[in-house]
Amino acid sequence: GGYTGDVICDTCGKVVEQGQTLEPGEHQEAVLDVKDATCYVTGYTGDTYCSFCNIKLAEGTVTPKLEHEYEDNVCKNCGRINNAQLDTTYTSKTTNLYPFQVIQFKAPENGTYKFYCENITNWDSYGYLFKEENFNDQVIIDGIEKFNAKKADSGAEIPTLSGYWQCDDEHGKNSAPAITAELEKDKTYYFVVGPYSTATGEFSITITCTHEKTHREGRTLSDCTEGGYTG
């Protein structure tokens, strides 16, 4: 509440008019510092303040991280791709909530494979290839923290991931990454696409075999009466 104040005579100091006590008014509630939960970080419901007097009226609560929910091997929450297949083109995107996108791949045979990306929208992307033993969600969580710090302060370090096996930022199409690597049969690898700085966007990725190791089958020899087959 409040008080209107007394009216005082400047000459004699007498109270000319008594003030009135005011009843407290209703707070104008505003919720601040809301944070959405994702597959990698917890959320926050936000603190409630009075937008008029700026008093905090209520504390918010932490909300748990989301679970990866897969449908056709794609997480419905974050877009993460599990069990990526050879010669299949996947379209995905990064956002401010999910600045890094994960593609899991298990090599069907020993051999050389290429992870080739194309930026569909105009942004500068980075690609990282991880061996299974060096990758977990904490890698992405650390990257998100760097990304958010860079968004808040342009002078902060670029949001580079740690622990990767190989990385690239230019050998795909439209400033997208492409990485070629010798992989082991039945080993799992993780290819991660993320921002060079703070720009996010849409991209496609295709994993192919480079056919560096070949052999010939079905060869037959020709003579004067019958043809042959090169195999």
What is the role of each PLM region?
Residues V34-D36, T91, K185:
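Residue-level detector of functional hotspots within protein domains
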Residues N83-K93:
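Predominantly extracellular/luminal regions of secreted and cell-surface proteins
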Residues T94-E212, D223:
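Acidic, Ser/Thr/Pro-rich low-complexity intrinsically disordered segments
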Residues G1-N83, H211-G231:
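Thrombospondin type-1
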